[in-house]
Curated annotation (Swiss-Prot):
Chain intervals for the UniProt region annotation (Disordered): 1-20
Protein name, as recorded: Phospho-2-dehydro-3-deoxyheptonate aldolase
Reaction equations catalysed: D-erythrose 4-phosphate + phosphoenolpyruvate + H2O = 7-phospho-2-dehydro-3-deoxy-D-arabino-heptonate + phosphate
Pfam families: DAHP_synth_2 (PF01474)
GO molecular function terms noted in the UniProt entry: 3-deoxy-7-phosphoheptulonate synthase activity
Subunit comment: Homodimer.
Swiss-Prot/TrEMBL keywords: Amino-acid biosynthesis, Aromatic amino acid biosynthesis, Transferase
Gene Ontology BP term (one): chorismate biosynthetic process
Gene name for this UniProt entry: aroH
Annotated family: Belongs to the class-II DAHP synthase family.
Biased composition (Polar residues): 1-13
Cystine crosslinks: none
InterPro entries linked: Aldolase_TIM, DAHP_synth_2
């Protein structure tokens, strides 16, 4: 595996000539330039060879030979870079992955919204409270959450804090996933505890018992594969702040190709996917696996143009369409996209994001999501693919390993009146640990019905 040491002066900077949506307006451009220069000198957070490995795994997803589980915080926070937070999030994803692997009988590619998800696009540039108007909070990588003038000024030094927070997180994730913490038998024991304590546990008991029997059978045969003790885990985030992403773009010394070494996979969001704008241009220059969020306004023509721009060689594993339609629209909007893309001969991975199209404001003023809506969008996604004979490639979920109260519903039900108890998100509502595991068991049932 190669350390991407060399940086081309113009590496990944062609986007600078194009309009770039959702970029912060820094008051001190000299300070920004100094930060970019520092970032360009920093070591890579991931290696090109690892990005290629994920491309190969995503190719299997696109061909129907694997399933993607992508999840993590809506927006990471600097003050949440702690062993407990990271471990709980990873534990939840590993538990979900174990259930899905057994039920689907295909490898589950595990990718975190982690170690870089510190920025958020916003619908409005400013926020007004009690007659005071300040810049919107855009994530810890841009400005502070506190509603004060000082906190809300975009500060380029935060880009360096994002790099260091991401490095700390990745270091711990690598230790957990290779040091025995991710052992499959341990993960299964956690799932058994969940099944026992969950109000929905009875529904999941059969599947948990089957997994138990399979593990007991292997143990009786004297089988103890090394794969049981470690897990492959990749990082991903939205490539939103182009100054940061391009500063961490390197030339791979093996191939001469450009890689964004801030994460294994990056995606372009619904608000920044304009074909003739900077984000798509940046994504077209790097070799990482790329995701594109597709909302309900996406046309089949646009989807085909993304393929032309981002995957001209038609390489499975390069491009992932992350569909975020809303539970009430997925069954109407998705079929044409899948049909036209499939007819074009392109092999892309189709993933459902059942979170972003299902947000509403509760009477209390909290942004929330109904677990039943999230589940219904996933159901619609599976139904569409089943009817077309195509592969439902995976799920992309905003979740936490903590017992927060941000989304309503679930087996261990959260009510609207409970939202205030532990509403901790910096931006959008996340599924808590129990709701995430509920979702995994229910998606496992759907996959079996395919």
């Amino acid at each position: 595996m190669t350390v991407n040491a060399k940086t081309s002066p113009s590496a990944g900077n062609t986007w600078r000539d194009l309009p770039a949506a959702q970029q912060p307006e820094y008051p001190d451009t000299e300070a920004l330039r100094a930060v970019i220069a520092d970032l360009e000198s920093y070591p890579p957070l991931v290696f090109a060879g690892e990005c290629d490995q994920l491309r190969a795994r995503m190719a299997a997803v696109a061909k129907g030979e694997a399933f993607l589980l992508q999840g993590g915080d809506c927006a990471e926070a600097f003050d949440a870079v702690s062993a407990d937070h990271i471990r709980n999030k990873l534990k939840t994803l590993l538990q979900m992955g174990a259930v899905l692997t057994y039920a689907a009988s295909v490898p589950v590619v595990k990718v975190g919204r982690i170690a870089g998800q510190y920025s958020k696009p916003r619908s409005k540039p400013t926020e007004t409270r009690d007659g005071v108007t300040l810049p919107t909070y855009r994530g810890d990588s841009v400005n502070g959450f506190d509603f004060t003038e000082a906190a809300r000024i975009p500060d380029p030094e935060r880009l360096k804090r994002m790099y260091h927070a991401s490095a700390s997180t990745l270091n711990l994730v690598r230790a957990f996933t290779t040091g025995g913490y991710a052992d499959l038998r341990q993960v299964h024991a956690w799932n058994q505890d969940f099944v026992k304590s969950s109000p929905s546990g009875q529904r999941y008991e059969q599947l948990a018992r089957e997994i138990d029997n399979a593990l007991n059978f292997m143990r009786a045969c004297g089988t103890d594969p090394a794969e049981f003790q470690t897990v492959e885990f990749f990082s991903s985030h939205e490539a939103l702040l182009l100054d940061y992403e391009s500063a961490l773009t390197r030339v791979d010394s093996r191939t001469g190709q450009l890689y964004d070494v801030s994460g294994h996979m990056v995606w372009i969001g619904e608000r920044t996917r304009q074909l003739d704008h900077a984000h798509i241009e940046f994504a077209s220059r790097i070799r990482n696996p790329i995701g594109i969020k597709l909302g309900p306004s996406t046309t089949a023509e646009e989807a085909l143009q993304y393929i032309e721009r981002l995957d001209p060689e038609r390489e499975p594993g390069r491009l992932t369409f992350i569909v975020r339609m809303g539970a009430d629209k997925i069954r109407d909007k998705l079929p044409e996209l899948v049909e036209k893309v499939t007819a074009s001969g392109a092999t892309v991975a189709w993933i459902t994001d059942p979170m972003h199209g299902n947000t509403y404001e509760a009477a209390s003023g909290h942004k929330t999501r109904r677990f039943d809506d999230v589940l219904d969008e996933v159901k619609g996604f599976f139904e569409v693919h089943k009817s077309l004979g195509t592969h439902p490639g995976g799920i992309h979920v905003e979740l936490t390993g903590d017992d927060v109260t941000e989304c309503v519903g679930g087996g261990d039900e959260i009510f609207v009146d409970d939202l205030h108890q532990r509403y901790e998100t910096a931006c959008d509502p996340r599924l808590n640990r129990s709701q995430s595991l509920d979702l995994a068991f229910l998606v496992a049932e759907m996959y079996r019905d395919q």
